[in-house]
Amino acid sequence: MKKQKSFPMSAYEDLLGKITAPTITVENWEGILAFCDMINNDFEGSKTGIKSLRKRLNNRDPHVVLLAISVLDSCWANCEERFRKEVSSAQFINELKALCTSSQRQVAEKMRLTVQKWVDTECKTEQSLSLIVTLHKNLVADGYSFVVDDPKSKTKAIDAKFANDPNYVGSAQEEEAIAKAIAASLADAEKQEKAKKSTSTMYPSAKASSPAVQTNSNIPEKNVRALYDFEAAESNELSFVAGDIITITDESNPHWWTGRIGTQQGLFPSSFVTNQLDDLKSKETDSSQKAPEVVASINEAILVRCLQVLHECDPTGERQDPEDLAQLEAASYAQGNLIDAHLASIDRQSNSLAQIDVAIRDVLALYDDAIQKGGFQHQSQGMYQQPMQQYNYQQPPNRAYYPPTGPVQQQQPQQYPPQHYPAPGAQPQYACPPNSVPQPQQQQQQWPAPSSQPQQY
């Protein structure tokens, strides 16, 4: 069939909306086949059809999703191979997995049955549909069923199977009646057990044990040692403390024995005593002798020696360990708390030194900043004060005036040495460094001293 021009996305959505409307109760096969023809007659029909189907498959209404699955199955069977490749693409395979594992039972079952049908038909001949086969295998491995789960058919099959079994219960009423009967029987059994417990005691009475004592009088007595303290709660019980030696007169009952301490006799729990009389004391004395008290102190030599001895030990056990290994290990373990405390104090000192270092750096930074600011102000003041100091002008000294006594003689005006002044706005040229400018008193002009004789005018 010759391909026509591509249809718009809206045409697919309109047609798909009609054949998957929520009001439809039965599949509209005429519309479904028209949708398949639209995909086959379109250049991009496979991709556009998949996009429109994806929207309907993700609808919230399960009825719409069931109709969309029917449309998808029909397109799989009636469209070309390109459509099946789009369905088996990595992007759409996640949609299929979500539908197969959906919480809606009918949707999940229908999608799994559709995948099962695809695997049994087209996927066997077309190698490009391998992702569908992989999805089917993963679902089977996860325990999903590919059979319709119909509760009614299950109950019918079970009823037919156990129709001749008298113990089979087919109705809810029979099951409820049986449950009530079982509960009543359990209640009666509990009452009987409570009555038995009230008439009997937790341990054999003294009267019951007296024949045993008489019959077992020929059995040799033995001594046991108390492990824990026991205080008698009844008159026929025997009280003792840990370490007491008890003579056993009857041990026919595995839980309560009869014994005596001196003139006192009675029952006591067998788990409170032991047959080992001197083993514990000997072990305590041996351990006290083998493990002398270790004075805890940090000693690097002991740690180094312990490591050397451990390296020399034989891991196979063929050669015995050195004799001083136990003492070295005990001394090394005793230093653990002291070493931890010493390391903690070192950490505290390191932290305090780090804080002091930061404070010193801050102070030095402030000092450098102050020095830089002070040097700039000093240079700026020298630039404006030194020209005034260099050119310090003074008025000529006042001279006394005497009236002329004779003829006035013309006198040439006194010639002063020429002075060169800087032009306005020009910066003065310094002949010496700024910090070595002489004082203004040294740069004053020397005026000629007045003559001692009055001048004649």
Swiss-Prot record:
Residues 394-414, 422-457 have a biased composition (Low complexity). Residues 366-383 form the ITAM domain. Residues 219-278 form the SH3 domain. The keyword Transport applies. SUPFAM superfamilies: ENTH/VHS domain (SSF48464), SH3-domain (SSF50044). Disulfide bonds: none annotated. Widely expressed, including the pharyngeal intestinal valve, several head neurons, and phasmids in both males and hermaphrodites throughout development. In males, also expressed in the gonad and sensory neurons in the tail. Expressed in the male-specific ciliate CEM, ray B-type and hook HOB sensory neurons. CDD domains: GAT_STAM, VHS_STAM. InterPro entries: ENTH_VHS, SH3-like_dom_sf, SH3_domain, STAM, UIM_dom, VHS_dom. Residues 19-147 form the VHS domain. Residues 198-216 have a biased composition (Polar residues). It is found in: Cell projection, Cilium; Endosome. Residues 173-192 form the UIM domain. PROSITE patterns: SH3, UIM, VHS. GO terms for molecular function: phosphatidylinositol binding; ubiquitin binding. One of its GO terms (biological process) is protein transport to vacuole involved in ubiquitin-dependent protein catabolic process via the multivesicular body sorting pathway. Keywords: Cell projection, Cilium, Developmental protein, Endosome, Protein transport, SH3 domain, Transport. Pfam families: SH3_1, VHS. Residues 196-216, 394-457 are annotated as: Disordered. The keyword Transport applies. One of its GO terms (cellular component) is ESCRT-0 complex. Isoform a, but not isoform b, interacts (via C-terminus) with lov-1 (via C-terminus). Belongs to the STAM family. Binds, sorts and targets the polycystin complex (lov-1 and pkd-2) for lysosomal degradation, acting on early endosomes located at the ciliary base. Functions in the germline together with the ephrin receptor (vab-1) signaling pathway to negatively regulate MAPK activation. May have a role as a positive regulator of meiotic maturation in oocytes, acting independently of vab-1. This is Signal transducing adapter molecule 1. It comes from Caenorhabditis elegans.
